[in-house]
Swiss-Prot record:
The keyword Magnesium is annotated on this UniProt entry: no
Family per similarity comment: Belongs to the HPr family.
Name of the protein in question: HPr-like protein Crh
Keywords attached to this entry: Phosphoprotein
Lineage of the species this protein comes from: Bacteria, Bacillati, Bacillota, Bacilli, Bacillales
Pfam families: PTS-HPr (PF00381)
Domain HPr: residue ranges: 1-84
Phosphoserine modified-residue sites: S46
Cited InterPro entries: HPr, HPr-like, HPr-like_sf, PTS_HPr_Ser_P_site
Organism the protein comes from: Halalkalibacterium halodurans (strain ATCC BAA-125 / DSM 18197 / FERM 7344 / JCM 9153 / C-125) (Bacillus halodurans)
Source organism, top-level taxon: Bacteria
Length: 84
């Protein structure tokens, strides 16, 4: 299991279109992927779960990956979240 705190640098945060693209990226991996914000943990492969966190730009989230490609998934998703 890999766990890392990440600051969301996307201009619009993880809302609507960026959230859909993030979920699409997360679904490329076989690992289980979760995002935690303010004590609430959701499946990062679920658009509804992700939207329920209301992640805005500048938010700090915890990204958790667990599985065969956990490291690769972590790196790809951090790169996505930290894009400005």
């Amino acid at each position: 299991m890999v766990e890392k705190q990440v600051e969301v640098k996307l201009k619009t945060g993880l809302q609507a279109r960026p959230a859909a693209l993030f979920v699409q990226e997360a679904n490329r991996f076989t690992s289980e992927i979760f995002i935690e914000k303010d004590g609430k943990k959701v499946n990062a492969k679920s658009i509804m779960g992700l939207m329920s966190l209301a992640i805005g730009s500048g938010s700090t989230i915890t990204l958790i990956t667990e599985g065969n490609d956990e490291q690769e998934a972590m790196e790809a998703l951090i790169a996505f979240i930290e894009k400005e």
